[in-house]
Structures are given as C-alpha cells and as structure tokens.
Amino acid sequence: MSVLEKTSDMSLSVRSADPLRGILLKVISVFFFVAMATMLKATQTIPSGEMVFFRSFFALLPVLLYLGWKGRLRHAFATKRPLGHVLRGLVGVASMSLGFFALTRLPLPEATAINYATPLLIVIFSALLLGERVHYFRWTAVVIGLVGVIVILWPRLTIFAGGAALGEAEAVGALAALMAAVLSAFAMMAVRNLVHTERTETIVTYFFISASILSLLTLPLGWVWPTPEQAALLIGAGFFGGVGQLLMTSSYRYADMSVIAPFEYVSLILTIIIGFVIFADVPTLPMLAGAVIIVASGIAVILRERWLGLDRARAKEASTP
C-alpha cells in the first residue's frame, strides 16, 4: 500500500444525494489518514513490515465493530474468491511496506505527493493490460501528471543528479515511494476485479486479515520491541486507518466518486503543515511544483470522467423510448 492509499476501493453506489455531507465525510477521512501517516512516520525506527502489521491488525477493530453494529458482520467472511483476496493481499502488503519505508526516508508531503501517481498509473495499466479505451485527453493528463512525478523525484535520484543529490537515503526513499504507487495501482486493479463477485465489506475485511498474516513473514527480517510511546503510535495508526476507511466508505453513499475524489488532495495541504510543524520538513520548490502538476492532472482526469458520465447519461435518456 502506498503511503496514504486506502486499503481497498470501498466506494458504494450513491443511496441518497447529499454532496455536502459526502464531501465533509471525505475531508474528515483525509484527516484520519494523514494522522495515520504522521503516527507511522513518528516511529521511524520500526521496520516497515512491523508497521504493516499494526496498521492492518488494529484497523480491523473499528471495521468489525461497525459491521457488527450494522448487522453485516456475517457477510464480511462470505467469499467466492479466496485466492483473489490472497493475491490482492500480497500486492497490497508489498505496496504498504514500500510506502511506509518511504515515510521513514522522505518528508511527509513529498511521500504523499508521489503517492498521487497511483490513479495515473491505473489509467496506464488499465489500457495496456486490460485493453480499456483511453482517449487523447486522458493520455495527455496522465503524461503531464507523470512529468510532475519526475519533477519531484529528480533531485532525489543521486544517479542522475550530477553531484547535487540530496542523499542516498532520500534517493532510496523516493524510489520506494514510486514503487509503492506502482504496486498500489495493481492492487486497485485487483480490487476492481474482485468487486464483480465480492461485497465491499468482504474485500476490506479479508485484506486487513491477509495483510496482518502476511506481514508476519517479515519477522525474520528483524522486528523490534516498540517502546510504550511507539506502541501507542502504531496502535493509533491502525485504529485511525480503520476509522478513515469507514468514513471514506460513507462519503461515497452521498455523492458520486467524481464529486468526492478531488478532495483527496486536501491531504497535501495537511501534510505540508504537519511536516513543517512536527518534523521540521521545509517543502522544496521541486516538490511543490511537481505536486501542483500531479494534482492538476489528477483533477483533470476526474472531471473528464464526470463529463463523459454525464454525456453517456444524456445519450441514454435521449435514446429511451
């Protein structure tokens, strides 16, 4: 999983039109996910595999409590595709591990901005691997967005920076963040495949369970015993991640994804502020410039999808006898 990437696509069909409520829930969920990332970054001496375990295992608590309250707990474990969940778990755990590792090497806003490449990469992989039709406008937006990623990464990559590099640790962190975004895109494509037969709560529950189990495979790589403060931060990160997941799910009940999705970029503002106040991270000009390019291209893709959806709806209405 990438740094702020949600563990699965929990979007639901809109049940009642209340865009303002949906937007509010989305923004609150962003606060929870940013808080989660902040807590994880504050435990920098903890191995990323160990972070994945705490983030996944303790996210189960609010999710299962919510499903029990709604009377949907029994549905969460009914699956027709167990191997599909395992595959999604493997890719998701790898993405999360790389993303959390990047958090320990990069400023918080920079790791967040690189993560924004995920939806752009989904467009590319969907076209190349699934044969989805992508028009000129979306390709242009994707290419521009990837230019933004390069703008952010360039100063970090020592092999290309010609002596002006900012350190080997940052270079490794930048590459880890990029690979996390790539794997996150594949994870989202796996989720897209699962939603044809699986309930939303099933996908989410099995991911947290599989991630908790798979992360234990990193034990031989050297987990450490956390201090009480670190343990509190790790447990808090998991709990906040689970609550953020529920809030994000609820937001899509009240408005279309095309309305809600742009507010994900509120996280950039939050991480810049938190990074400066808590971690003394001063945003660099390449990071800010690249982030603006990525956000602009991402919003362009979202709006384009919305316009196409409206056009398809009008065409359908016009053809209805």
Descriptions of predicted regions:
Residues 1-28, 60-87, 160-166, 196, ...:
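Membrane-interface interhelical linkers
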Residues 1-25, 123-178, 182, 295-321:
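Juxtamembrane helix-loop boundary signature in multi-pass membrane transporters
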Residues 22-26, 79-89, 134-147, 173-174, ...:
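Cytoplasmic-side transmembrane-helix entry/capping segments in multi-pass membrane proteins
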Residues 32, 71-109, 115, 151, ...:
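Specific transmembrane alpha-helical segments of multi-pass solute transporters/efflux pumps
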